[in-house]
């Protein structure tokens, strides 16, 4: 278990650096003479036609609907494994990160709504600061090496996974619209087929892949966001086969490098390019970016700490062995690194609004995430032992 976690964390740390490079490159291109090339590339129309099925979308939407569905497939596999066998498999293990994650979603959302109260156009972005980017947060923590206790890393990992689960629920409930009955029926049939494969003990991944593709197309056409198809597929793939092997973990390990070194960097590059030249000072300090930045930088640590403290005091949860509040606090600050997950929700929240709101949301996400990363890193570095244990 510990070896698997260490391997996961080391890969995510490398991915965090690549994510940062992708963001910097996107910002440079969006604010240089190459801006037209950057926007034109993302706006390139890509069409896939099979018989009566015709999918015709700009490259940006293929990235957000297609590649991110694979990322959510990976998240679903991780959540299922942790729920059945890992850090969330018992009430005692799951209690503290669960309360922490709930607080870390509610308080940032509340701060955002406080700044955007009474504006129906911008209020839809309330969930943007509720997300945590697991790759970037773990990458920042990994910079401190062996000084960080494994129990603290597991706490952040468990908290971020529960946070991801919350984001999945939020997308399903609040960012789906104009539902197509026929597409939902087809999606339901595909889900029944996936469940039947699981119940029959089918461990070959190919049948799940075929039905999963049908499900993804149906969900894409249904009005429900297509990334949710990835989560459903993940929950249907068996964790353990009769011979003791794990089809779910095999797929998870296969997807990890693709997610870490391709999917997330490509998503970050496609979504982080904010043209600053078109923004006035008033826009930069408007409720959307300020609400998001403060929600991430202040709301996340306040929510995580407040709910964790109350849960421990009420004996609903307990701190990990050897870990105190002075170590939990900077980790709570790191949870404010929303980055790719927050930008993804921003792309959904302001999909039908003026593009300016999407740019402001991404800018607020970048500012809040960078400040949260710096605060969390230096704070944790200060409270940890100077030498590795």
From Swiss-Prot:
Q: Which Pfam families match?
A: Na_H_antiport_1
Record key words, sorted = Antiport, Cell inner membrane, Cell membrane, Ion transport, Membrane, Sodium, Sodium transport, Transmembrane, Transmembrane helix, Transport
The reaction(s) catalysed by this protein are: Na(+)(in) + 2 H(+)(out) = Na(+)(out) + 2 H(+)(in)
Disulfide bridge positions per record: none
Q: What is its main location?
A: membrane
Q: Name one GO molecular function term.
A: sodium:proton antiporter activity
Q: What GO cellular-component annotations does this UniProt entry give?
A: plasma membrane
Where is the protein localized? Cell inner membrane
Q: Where are the membrane-spanning stretches?
A: 17-37, 59-79, 95-115, 124-144, 154-174, 177-197, 213-233, 261-281, 287-307, 328-348, 363-383
| GO BP term, pick one | regulation of pH
User: In what way does this protein cross or attach to the membrane?
Assistant: Multi-pass membrane protein
Entry's PANTHER family? NA(+)_H(+) ANTIPORTER NHAA (PTHR30341:SF0), SODIUM ION/PROTON ANTIPORTER NHAA-RELATED (PTHR30341)
HAMAP family from the UniProt entry: NhaA
What this protein is reported to do is described as: Na(+)/H(+) antiporter that extrudes sodium in exchange for external protons.
Q: Which family does it belong to?
A: Belongs to the NhaA Na(+)/H(+) (TC 2.A.33) antiporter family.
Which NCBIfam families does the UniProt entry name for this protein?
A: NhaA, PRK09560.1, PRK09561.1
Q: What is this protein called?
A: Na(+)/H(+) antiporter NhaA
Species name: Shewanella sp. (strain ANA-3)
Gene encoding this polypeptide? nhaA
